[in-house]
Amino acid sequence: MFEVVIGLEVHAQLNTKTKIFCSCATSFGEAPNTNVCPTCLALPGALPVLNEEAVKKAIAFGKAVNATINKKSVFNRKNYFYPDLPKAYQISQFDIPIVEKGELFINVKGENKRIGITRAHLEEDAGKNIHESNFSKVDLNRAGTPLLEIVSEPELRSSDEAVAYLKKLHSIIRFLDISDANMQEGSFRCDANVSIRPKGDTKLYTRVEIKNLNSFRFIQKAIEYEVKRQSEAWEDGTYEQEVVQETRLFDTTNLVTRSMRGKEEAAEYRYFPDPDLLPVLLKDEFLDIKIPELPDEKKVRFIDKLGIKESDAEVLISSLEMSRFFESLISQNLNPKLCVNWLNTELMGLLKGELTIENSPVDAQKLGVLIKRIEDGTISAKAAKDVLAFVFENTSVEIDEAIEKLGLKQVSDDSAIEAVIEQILNANADKVAEYKSGKDKLFGFFVGQTMKEGKGAFNPAKVNEILKTKLG
């Protein structure tokens, strides 16, 4: 039996307006090679100037994971040649990063586990190579975009733990609002270092790095395949030949990893302090950055202060957008538990395909009005589902307008309800007698008949109240 050893390196693209060492924009999707300048292009004489906002965002992350924030950190040159790296070196941090010795906690199958964060350092992103059939193109728009590289301790023991760690990290980064962490656009990328060892052994065996994984599903599949490949090689006696220190890519079509190149050691990058950049010396006020409420803190508040079930609270903190939507709902002085039901169950049940809470056709304000109409008795909860479905498809229609159009406004007029109840009681005199002789369950029959005659428009609370009076 083998134990799996996994360490993860995450590159989070920081959402600064400009690049880390120049004033070029960081916007995604621009025409190739338009967000560039002499610094991005590594033209002679162009010097880097550090972006202060990138430093602040790195500090915010450090505080969120209970890390040590170094008052002095150093930028180094990481030397390697690749077409999308104009300087033939990357400005990064090596032995003195801005953040180190952090932690976060994951929950897998009901068990909490602490995962150490070795370090988080600032660096610049490379450009992008676009490979055609007979040639390759280079787009340097991304070159110089600020990255925060977050390195975990090799303490993850399964693909499930790795995904739980990444989801937690992704959530923290989004709630801090330091990155949009959009995996499809490459602003949250992961490299997984995977090795195996016999259970009980403490030695670290040959690790394989799987590069640029950009979805939770692919991360899980890549790790599972790599563990299977290494385990089979060990059992076949070919481990030393098959498992070498290398970088592998994940084939998303066939769900296998393939060899890309040999894995470099740190010495091969010839790190040395960048002579164009002074060490970063942080004043105390930099360390006093206030960070927003994080997912775990929100969850505790939702449970303790609002009386929400833990399972519902988990859904509410599953994304920054979901959390903001809920906070916007309860800010309208609505019942929190009613808000949870209409958000987590009813609205989320309608969001399919490309629709998410972020681009929901029904916003928090509109859903809030619907919940108010349930609370004030204008419509029943059952009718409200029809109203929600209607405004979901007809986005220009407001809640009150939809209620009128659909004819779903509840009747709360006592005289109208009393007239119908009188008819039902007179038509069912035998059942009235049975009820009065002790058959209490017949009360539901009278309620049902009244609601049926009222075509669902009667206020159920009023119906119950009047029936109790009439039946004694």
Curated annotation (Swiss-Prot):
Catalysed conversion reaction: L-glutamyl-tRNA(Gln) + L-glutamine + ATP + H2O = L-glutaminyl-tRNA(Gln) + L-glutamate + ADP + phosphate + H(+); L-aspartyl-tRNA(Asn) + L-glutamine + ATP + H2O = L-asparaginyl-tRNA(Asn) + L-glutamate + ADP + phosphate + 2 H(+)
Superkingdom of origin organism: Bacteria
UniProt keyword annotations, A-Z: ATP-binding, Ligase, Nucleotide-binding, Protein biosynthesis
Family annotation (Gene3D superfamilies): 1.10.10.410, GatB domain, N-terminal subdomain (1.10.150.380)
Secretion signal, residue range per the UniProt entry: none
Coiled-coil segments on the chain, per record: none
This enzyme's EC code(s): 6.3.5.-
GO biological process, one term: translation
Function: Allows the formation of correctly charged Asn-tRNA(Asn) or Gln-tRNA(Gln) through the transamidation of misacylated Asp-tRNA(Asn) or Glu-tRNA(Gln) in organisms which lack either or both of asparaginyl-tRNA or glutaminyl-tRNA synthetases. The reaction takes place in the presence of glutamine and ATP through an activated phospho-Asp-tRNA(Asn) or phospho-Glu-tRNA(Gln).
Family classification: Belongs to the GatB/GatE family. GatB subfamily.
Name assigned to this protein: Aspartyl/glutamyl-tRNA(Asn/Gln) amidotransferase subunit B
Organism: Campylobacter jejuni subsp. jejuni serotype O:2 (strain ATCC 700819 / NCTC 11168)
